Amino acid sequence: MDLQIDQKIINELLNERDYFDTNETYYCIVDQQHVIDLYQKDLTESIISDNIQKDGYFFTDINTVLDFIANGEFLLQLKVPSKNHELVVISVESGWKSNMILMDSIYCLDSISTFEFLYKKNIDHNKLVSLARKYLNSEMLDFLIDKGLRMRPNLKYISDWATITNNPLESRFNSKLLSRIPFLAVTDTLPGQNNGICIINNVILTDIENLFCELSKGKFVLEVLIPVNEFDKKILMNFNSKGKVWVSEVYCVGYQNLDDISILQHLIALGCNKMHVLLFTIKSHRESSTTMLLSNYVFDKIELEYALCIAAVSGNFNVFSSIINTVKNSYYTTEQKISSLINLDLILREEVNLPVRINYTPTTYTDIILVLAVIGGSVEIICLLLKYFYQQIIDNYHILTKYSIMYENGDMMDLLRNIYKGFYSNFQTNNESDSLFNKNILKTDN
């Protein structure tokens, strides 16, 4: 049963003190002794701790509090007085600490009513499942399943199920949970159906964190269930160290075509890193998908500059042009220097099959973009950059020519030769774009 503080005391506190926001409520998780200690204090007075960093009261928001379920068995709902002259609040990792708190309610974490209360707060289902798993509470899990379990695929749940345990409650809980989580598989063809059931054998499963390492292997993302609760089936699995699991048999319950823009938004909502999604669309020349991501999601300056590098080496003019406009707009929102992580050698090693190593160390971001654009082989991209960086192309002519020879791009070699001979000397440098690239000098390690 939920433990409630005397409402008369709460009313007195509300009348006597102001709050940062009377509608703002904070939470923390504590053990039984902590609850006893709090109730032994006079609740009509603020609870005071002199050493906040060491002894202060930690609290956080409702969306974060279940990250701390290992701290105890009780959920405290509390508020903080705002205008008490002795109040001190400091920010700490994942929350705050204060020398004063005012308690509203205490909930037992193993109670189904507490679980329902947290569910109504729209807490992430993965966190709610972690709470249910702490107590191996099938009633909580059933409640969540009835409401429509929405979980991000995570290979940890397969590992938990496959771990041998002597606790039958734990085995049943893990089996029920695993049978309800849709995992992901990437394939080039859609599976057929047998008596209305789509069964797939010998499948490599992945989770949301590792999905985009697999996308080059197909154009469909399958959602599959592992039939671990069917006693007439013997499911075989094999784990590796690269975020993949081989499973002998699964049921396909849905699929998405990667040509459909909406699947990318769905995967980001599931927890896919939006930068991984953006790089995938650039490398696979999905222009409309790239435009959608740039329009609907926020990328920081370093992410945009790295994306521009990949667009240059991919040789797609339309994608490159779209990104370069976004990068120019982002430049004026921050004075942040360009990251030394944008390293030419690193990009060439990971993104390009470079046949020969050239001893060359770029000094500006422009140098990197020019080299990558030449490797990408798009004459249109070089022509776009020409009106901004004519002099830089002249200065880098010899190194750019070496790269064009390595990649046997005759059109690129002819263009660079004509630029060097002055055939395009009437191009004027655009100072705005010039400042975007050249004020950011790279820090390179020799």
From Swiss-Prot:
InterPro entries: Ankyrin_rpt-contain_sf. The keyword Repeat applies. ANK repeats lie at residues 71-100, 124-153, 206-237, 245-277, 303-332, 365-394. The keyword Repeat applies. Keywords: ANK repeat, Repeat. This is Putative ankyrin repeat protein L273.
